[in-house]
Amino acid sequence: MSLINSTAIPSGATGYEIDQSLRFNGGANSSASPYLSLTPASAGNRKTWTLSCWIKRGSLGSYQTIFAQKDSSSENGEIYFDASDVLYWHLGGGSNYRWYTTPKYRDPSAWLHLVFSLDTSTAGGRAVTDMQRIYVNGEIVTDKGSTANPVANYEGNINKAEQHEIGSRDGTHNFLTGHMAEMHFIDGTALTPTSFGETGDYGEWKPIAYSGSYGTNGFYLPFKQDYTVEGFSTVTYKGNGGTQYIGGTGFSPNLVWAKYRNASGNHSLFDTIRGATKRLYSNATDAENTHTGTLKSFDSD
């Protein structure tokens, strides 16, 4: 698994560019193949969510997982290419609600923008045949089949408080081979591709920056190496409302200065002597106070 420069994903009219991707060099069933995993601390919305990512296939003709939930009962929720190179989306949870495309995706030189939009809630108003939507390069896939349609308010396995994988079915099977860029998971909202891309001047589909919220278990993976460490570095950090790692300092920092850049608020100073939960205000004369919502820990790069 490695970061690759020059993905050649064209930028949109906004000037937004995706200039790096993550390469998955998986084998069919090798436990040594690379993949990513995450386990939510608590379950999110299992009726309504959106997954968006860019994929460039590296090999064809085998089962390859994009995103999956590893269930103890083996009833995985899973999004994958099958051996005939169609896209499958299995909701999991003990029911065979499985949606698949008729088109086959067999061009290893092309980038595909994939959006999987789920809404089984009655409030969403979707027909049972339309609760699972797949979009490819901005277009909804209507040439499709299914083994069974989900019932209203059905809760699939993805977004449970259990292990999820990117690039593998369960850590032992169906490893992805290819490149992936810009993965967004939106918890609690069923979106369309226009939240992530737009049509260019020549009819091509191009990425744009996502500006919405992510919900409880949502996340954004840019798959981008965003710094180069050369000794001591000063790092500025743009928050997104979630817990994130700040790297690029080149060492384990002894002092962190946190301040708002687009809103009013106190400037908070943290140091290794007092600890990550003790802060001072640089713009006030107050004594130190205990605060756990800004800095989690001091760690080495």
Model-based region annotation:
Residues 4, 63-67, 141:
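Local beta-strand/beta-hairpin segments that build beta-sheet-rich folds
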Residues 48, 67-69:
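Glycan-recognition patch characteristic of GH18 chitinases/ENGases
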Residues 1-16:
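Short, intrinsically disordered N-terminal pre-domain segments
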Residues 121-123:
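Short glycine/acidic-enriched loop and turn motifs that connect beta-strands
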Residues 127-130:
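Short coil-to-beta strand junction motifs in C2/discoidin
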Residues 48-52, 111-113:
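Intrinsic-disorder/low-complexity, polar/charged segments enriched in Ser/Thr/Lys/Arg/Asp/Glu/Gln
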Residues 9-11, 19-35, 39-40, 57-60, ...:
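Surface-exposed molecular-recognition determinants
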